[in-house]
Amino acid sequence: MKRVALLVQYDGSYFSGWQRQKNAISVQEMIEDALFKVSNQMIKTFAAGRTDSGVHASGQVVHFDIDFVIPSDRYANVLNSRLPSTIRILESVEVKKNWHACYSAVYRHYRYVINNSKIPNLFLNKWSWHRYQKSLDEFLMSKALNGMIGEHDFYAFQKSGSTRSTSVTTIKSIEIERTEDLILIDIKATGFLYGMVRSIVGQLVLVGEKKISPEIFKDRWVGKKKQDVHESAPANGLCFVNSVYQETIFKRIDKNDLFPKFVIRGYS
């Protein structure tokens, strides 16, 4: 029996999220079905992040245990030939038996993309939130982030239905960058609450549109005023970029190649 890790990309718009569900198509189901076709074994997979319905991944990390003749580094190609084109395995490697895709992660990285152009762009629609009504002030949005780094209770940004025992987590970094009309919001944290990133982005957009002040933004999460957090950004703008571990797991793929990239209209 060996443990194999996969580096996975998927277009979340075709799936109900990572986790297997009874009446919907999930990424986990697709990968486990592909493993069954290969090995005739019922294999359970584990992921670094349980992305919600419609959320993409450019560097999801998955592991599974298997007793089969295929070399570990061959699973990427073998599975890709049995997966839909909306899921790609970038690399497969054997890892230690005590290594875990979720529990061994030091932190996870999500990126949210907002298209702030007044002109719609069909080729960006699937991968970004077209928020065009007002020009967003990214400097005000950045100001609102003051005090968020570190361990805090982010209950205000947790959607109902969470199975977590606590709403406390640690944000390692959160940055906002504008490239022409695209606004990129990168958040790295040890763990993410259910709906956390989309709730944060929804509130930041209100700050950027000057509908609420940076002070009100902070008061809502510090004061755990979940009842005041109504706006949530749509799923299509969110991408699980990668998860980081103490040791280097994947050798062939540079981490910079995992960032979602746009090469249209001058965006890159």
Swiss-Prot record:
Pfam families referenced in this protein's UniProt entry, alphabetically: PseudoU_synth_1
UniProt entry tagged with the keyword tRNA processing: yes
GO molecular function: RNA binding; tRNA pseudouridine(38-40) synthase activity
Binding site for substrate: Y110
Keywords annotated in UniProt: Isomerase, tRNA processing
Purpose of the protein: Formation of pseudouridine at positions 38, 39 and 40 in the anticodon stem and loop of transfer RNAs.
Name assigned to this protein: tRNA pseudouridine synthase A
Record gene name: truA
